Regions:
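Short, acidic/small-residue loops that bind anionic groups at enzyme active sites
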Residues: 95-115
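Mid-chain, well-packed structural core segment of small domains
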Residues: 60-100
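Short hydrophobic/aromatic-enriched beta-strand-loop microsegments
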Residues: 30, 47-58, 126-129
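Short, glycine-/small-residue-rich phosphate/pyrophosphate-handling segment
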Residues: 110-134
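Histidine-anchored nucleotide/phosphate-binding helix
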Residues: 13-22
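Short internal beta-strands
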Residues: 28-37
Length: 134
């Protein structure tokens, strides 16, 4: 499973805590993240994470392109709906693409936990079957 990680600045520490809590499950998957999020997650967990550009410098667009090409299976996007800054990822573009390509997406820690537990139980195996990987 290819999981993309994005976090607004005010949610990056929460992303690190989430990844630390679920390091065992995440370690069994391929992780992709935007610039600063990679460093924070890797420093907290030691997990290998494929590095993209920072969100405000094209990283969100890289993830969007990967979604469009079928290269992302899940998006964990910890957003700050109140304090998002200019230059942070375009939320609606990413969410629209996830809807168009049937990509499970979490925009907060509660939904991310539901997806991670579903991944652990095998509830999301249909994704790789649909993409012809198993």
């Amino acid at each position: 499973m290819r999981i993309a990680l994005i976090a607004h600045d005010s949610r990056k520490e929460l992303m690190a805590q989430f990844c630390t809590a679920y390091v065992r499950i995440l370690s069994e998957n391929d992780l992709i993240a935007t610039g600063v999020t990679v460093k924070i997650v890797h420093d907290a967990t030691g997990l290998p994470v494929r590095t993209l550009y920072p969100g405000g410098r094209g990283g969100a667009e890289q993830i969007a392109a990967m979604i469009g090409c079928g290269e992302v299976d899940m998006l964990l996007f910890f957003r700050d709906p109140v304090g998002a800054k200019p230059g942070e990822p375009n939320d609606m573009m990413l969410l629209r693409l996830c809807d168009m390509h049937t990509i499970p997406v979490a925009t907060n820690i509660a939904t991310a936990e539901v997806l991670i537990h579903g991944l652990e139980r095998g509830d999301l195996a249909w994704i790789e079957l649909q993409r012809g990987r198993k």
